[in-house]
Amino acid sequence: MGILEKKTAGPGGAARKTTTRAAGMAAEDRALAHLQAAGLRLLARNYRTPGRGGGEIDLILRDRDGTLVFVEVRSRASDAYGGAGASIGAAKRRRIVFAARHYLLRWPSPPPCRFDAVLVSGDAVQWLQAAFDAG
């Protein structure tokens, strides 16, 4: 058994990974419903750059004013360790910006853009508009 297998093996290893993925998808579903109720229109979900070392954007939407909104969805069962928002560090933001720039290559004249975060914690959904910038 290799090192990677040892890290995921054990009680509930595979089941935990599936449960975590399902919880993440459920949080994205809740975030999307919240944003659509606010008038945003979905353009892409789980957009990934090709190759290794790229980035992923959970949701890409268009706001009513035409702004392209790149959304990172974070979910935590509790507010321990800073809650959901604390998990969007500098490296994660760089990967999101990298993926956004890749996505924008398809636009002949890119619209204004914004980077939002939606934090899902328990029953609460918190939408942080302009949570960070591309700089």
UniProtKB/Swiss-Prot annotation:
InterPro entries (UniProt xref): Restrct_endonuc-II-like, tRNA_endonuc-like_dom_sf, UPF0102_YraN-like
Cited Pfam families: UPF0102
Disordered, as annotated region: 1-21
Gene Ontology molecular function: any one: nucleic acid binding
SUPFAM superfamilies given in the database record: Restriction endonuclease-like (SSF52980)
Family: Belongs to the UPF0102 family.
Protein name per UniProt: UPF0102 protein Aave_0630
Organism the protein comes from: Paracidovorax citrulli (strain AAC00-1) (Acidovorax citrulli)
